[in-house]
């Protein structure tokens, strides 16, 4: 009988140990799962912080641009004395986080004209981010959006040869079409968020 009692005790002890190990494994799995969730949440928070930091850096860079250039409404303009072809000038503006300047109304055009006079010494004209390269006579901005404001000195008749617009200081800020390979000064615009 003592032997039977010992066997029963041994059986229950083994059963109890098995249950304890099973529960321990389940708890460890749950703990690992919670830990992974926390790690995922932490990674999400870190990613969000990096995005915010990058956004702040962009805003700081724009403020620097505005300090060196001029601010008009929700745009900053920055002029460059170096002469470039239309495409090179636009690529340079894009590399800096903007585009060639695109006046959307007469107020912007006049402000851009005045800023160009002040900042581009001895220059009578500079590139605008406007062209009709794709469809002759249909002027679009450098993003491909149709232009709704126009300030032409004369109706562009440059044909396939003159496809890029520039602002002419001598004609009080009127636009003229020009050969895109011409070397001109330029002004970049940056949208302020």
UniProtKB/Swiss-Prot annotation:
S-S bridge residues: 66-76, 93-188, 164-180
Pfam family, one: Lectin_C
GO biological process: ossification
Domain called C-type lectin: residue spans: 72-189
SMART domains: CLECT (SM00034)
Family matches, as CDD domains: CLECT_tetranectin_like (cd03596)
Record InterPro entries: C-type_lectin-like, C-type_lectin-like/link_sf, C-type_lectin_CS, CLec_Tetranectin-domain, CTDL_fold
GO molecular function: carbohydrate binding
GO cellular component: extracellular space
Source domain of life: Eukaryota
Annotated keywords: Disulfide bond, Lectin, Secreted, Signal
PANTHER family listed in its UniProt record: C-TYPE LECTIN DOMAIN FAMILY 3 MEMBER A, TETRANECTIN-RELATED
Protein's name in the database: C-type lectin domain family 3 member A homolog
Species in which this protein is naturally found: Xenopus laevis (African clawed frog)
Source organism phylogeny: Eukaryota, Metazoa, Chordata, Craniata, Vertebrata
């Amino acid at each position: 009988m003592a032997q039977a009692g010992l066997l029963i005790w041994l059986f229950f002890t083994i059963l109890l140990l098995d249950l304890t190990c099973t529960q321990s494994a389940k708890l460890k799995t749950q703990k690992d799962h919670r830990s992974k969730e926390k790690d995922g949440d932490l990674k999400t928070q870190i990613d969000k912080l990096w995005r915010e930091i990058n956004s702040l850096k962009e805003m700081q860079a724009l403020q620097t641009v505005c300090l060196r250039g001029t601010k008009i409404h929700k745009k900053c303009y920055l002029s460059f004395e170096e002469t470039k072809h239309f495409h090179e000038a636009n690529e340079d503006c894009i590399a800096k986080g903007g585009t060639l300047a695109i006046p959307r109304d007469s107020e912007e055009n006049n402000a851009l004209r005045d800023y160009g006079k002040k900042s581009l010494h001895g220059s009578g004209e500079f590139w605008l981010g406007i062209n009709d390269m794709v469809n002759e006579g249909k002027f679009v901005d450098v993003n491909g959006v149709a232009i709704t404001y126009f300030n032409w000195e004369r109706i562009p008749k440059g044909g396939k040869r003159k496809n890029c617009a520039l602002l002419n200081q001598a004609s009080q800020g009127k636009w003229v079409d020009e050969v895109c390979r011409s070397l001109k000064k330029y002004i970049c615009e940056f949208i302020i968020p």
